[in-house]
Amino acid sequence: MELNEVYQYTKEHMEKTIDAMKRDFATLRTGKVSTAIVEPIRVDYYGTPTPLSQVGSVIASDATTLVISPWEKNLLKGIEKAIQEANIGVNPNNDGDVIKLFFPPMTSEQRKEIAKDAKALGEKAKVAVRNIRKESNDKIKKLEKDKLITEDQSKKAHDEVQKYTDDYVKKIDDMVKSKEEEILKV
């Protein structure tokens, strides 16, 4: 393994951490409803737990309403049941053709709570970035121990990995701040 491979590993994994945090952020409720809220929901489709998005279309018809149109009408009851079991804070409204989810406007307490969740997701991502830094630094130490790089190269490599870490932690902080503002905006 060379230093370039260590750098590549570090960047790739830190970028994956950012992507994972973005996916997590998508499930958080903000002022307007997002279809990502129902992504984790699984519907019993002929005995197989299937993502809701694969048994029907999910559309945000306005800022507070999601409309779920199943591709098979016989799935309406199953979708309704799955939504109730998912405990996402709303009751499904089944009109025989589609299921509508009406999300009430969030209270300031709810907004603060969700903002806290966003902050926690950011902290989780920062821990992941720091763990990647540790793994990369361990790889650099091993290269030095195996006499594949000099002590000076090792020091520079550690500094470079720290620079990546600082950059990604700053990205995470910026994303959390932006998400908090989005959540708290009335």
Swiss-Prot record:
The lineage of its organism: Bacteria, Pseudomonadati, Campylobacterota, Epsilonproteobacteria, Campylobacterales. Gene3D superfamilies: 3.30.1360.40, Ribosome-recycling factor. The gene is frr. InterPro entries: Ribosome_recyc_fac, Ribosome_recyc_fac_dom, RRF_sf. HAMAP family: RRF. It comes from the Bacteria. Belongs to the RRF family. SUPFAM superfamilies: Ribosome recycling factor, RRF (SSF55194). Keywords: Cytoplasm, Protein biosynthesis. GO terms for molecular function: ribosomal large subunit binding. Signal peptide: none annotated. This is Ribosome-recycling factor. It comes from Wolinella succinogenes (strain ATCC 29543 / DSM 1740 / CCUG 13145 / JCM 31913 / LMG 7466 / NCTC 11488 / FDC 602W).
